[in-house]
A protein has these predicted regions:
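Peripheral peptide segments
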Residues: 1-165
């Protein structure tokens, strides 16, 4: 059975629509779509992480842009990771929050993004008290797509099995 994380953070993508759209729809690349599909099938809360905007709720409408984490200055890049962590804590601590357990140690976060985003973000989130990991670390795009296909099947099987009990 596949464990479902509390939250998935999904890296944005280079391929985008050309008009303002909700973050969930703005990014059109196959890797983003595979990540989004997994999060939605798992039924877990998910956000987009963006070099320009930080943490994005999927329904937040934004305009297309061309900013990457590697394109940020050294200072801006260093500041980005704690900003995203703070935004995530704010989302969890919001009184109308989706998540009842405010103990960060019990919040499991999966980061599905490129190494430039994920490796340092895992460290920053763990330092803040979260349980965070990057399940597709060091995998190329093809292997990541395979991972998402297999994991989606596992989620489907888990749901079928759960329905029989």
């Amino acid at each position: 059975m596949t464990e479902i994380p509390s939250i998935m953070l999904i890296g944005c993508g280079r391929s985008k629509l050309q008009e303002q759209s909700p973050a969930r729809d703005l990014y059109t690349g196959s890797l983003f779509r595979a990540r989004r599909s997994l999060a939605e099938e798992m039924g877990c809360r998910w956000f987009v992480i963006s070099a320009k905007h930080g943490l994005l709720y999927p329904d937040r409408v934004i305009a297309p842009y061309d900013v990457t984490i590697d394109g940020l200055s050294v200072l801006d890049r260093a500041a980005w990771f704690p900003v995203v962590t703070s935004q995530l804590i704010d989302a969890i601590e919001d009184p109308g929050c989706f998540y009842d357990d405010r103990d960060l140690r019990r919040v499991t976060i999966e980061i599905h993004a490129g190494e430039s985003y994920a490796s340092r973000l895992v460290e920053t989130l763990r330092a803040a008290g979260f349980t965070a990991f990057h399940p597709v670390a060091n995998l190329g795009q093809g292997k990541q797509m395979e991972y998402y296909a297999v994991r989606r099947r596992q989620v489907g099987y888990s749901r079928i099995g759960a329905g029989r009990t």
